[in-house]
Regions:
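N-terminal pre-catalytic "stem/leader" segment of glycosyltransferase-like enzymes
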Residues: 1-49, 132
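Catalytic donor nucleotide-activated moiety binding site of glycosyltransferases and closely related
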Residues: 7-10, 146-184
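Short, solvent-exposed loop/turn segments at secondary-structure junctions
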Residues: 10-11, 46-49, 75-78, 128-132, ...
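Well-ordered, non-membrane alpha-helical segments in soluble/globular domains
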Residues: 14-21, 53-58, 139-151
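Nucleotide-activated sugar donor-binding and catalytic core shared by glycosyltransferases
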Residues: 25, 35-38, 111-143, 170-180
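Active-site regions of enzymes building and remodeling cell-envelope glycoconjugates
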Residues: 26, 31, 39-43, 55-59, ...
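A short, gly/pro- and small-residue-rich
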Residues: 49-77, 143-147
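A nucleotide-sugar donor-handling region in carbohydrate enzymes
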Residues: 67-138
């Protein structure tokens, strides 16, 4: 199999992840090229903004040709240590392989799922970048945040902590809102 890495359209923190993918594919006997014109394209994220915006052209070409795309992204479990790789997307729309995995990997990372809780010191709202494919068909992030805030306030006065996406910060959106505090990512 042949993989085309589109490194120049990756985020500034993407180099080690591209390097690891490249080394892993080579170790498994696959060919890897940079900016190739055949094989399976490997892009960074589905955020069509800044350095990563040219990935959209690659993505849309592959979708129109029913060609797979591998998407790399920083990890959500241990940021800077773990990373994600998905086929034809990342997060909700991607294929990540087998679904019936045992706990071996989670245990090696020291991960324990905590039960859902309906109480606590605050409610956490995590933002997304509204130029991301992951946010497709959603309102603007600022509109979504305000709708979510109003809905929460119908049910509770507990403090709300807003953690914005690092590249879609919505500066000062919390100002003037009752018990809303910002937590920078």
């Amino acid at each position: 199999m042949k993989f085309n890495l589109w490194r120049q359209y990756g985020a500034l923190n993407s180099s080690p992840v591209f390097d690891a993918f490249h080394a892993g594919a080579n170790a498994l006997g696959h060919d890897v090229v940079v900016n190739g014109d055949n094989g399976i394209d490997v892009i960074w994220s589905v955020l069509w903004n800044g350095r990563m915006s040219p990935n959209r052209i690659i993505w849309e070409k592959n979708v129109s040709q029913s060609k797979p795309t591998i998407v790399l992204e920083v990890g959500g479990i241990k940021r800077g240590t773990t990373w994600k790789v998905g086929l034809n997307g990342i997060n909700r729309t991607a294929y990540f392989g087998e679904q019936d995995n045992d706990r071996t990997r989670a245990d090696s990372l020291g991960l324990v799922c905590k039960p859902w809780r309906s109480n606590g010191d605050f409610i956490l709202i995590c933002g997304q970048h509204d130029k991301s494919l992951q946010w497709q068909d959603m309102p603007s992030m600022s509109n979504w945040f305000m709708q979510t805030y109003r809905e929460i306030r119908k049910h509770t006065d507990r403090p709300i902590v807003f953690r914005p996406h690092p590249r879609c910060r919505l500066p000062h959106i919390e100002l003037g809102l009752k018990h809303v505090y910002r937590q920078e990512p």
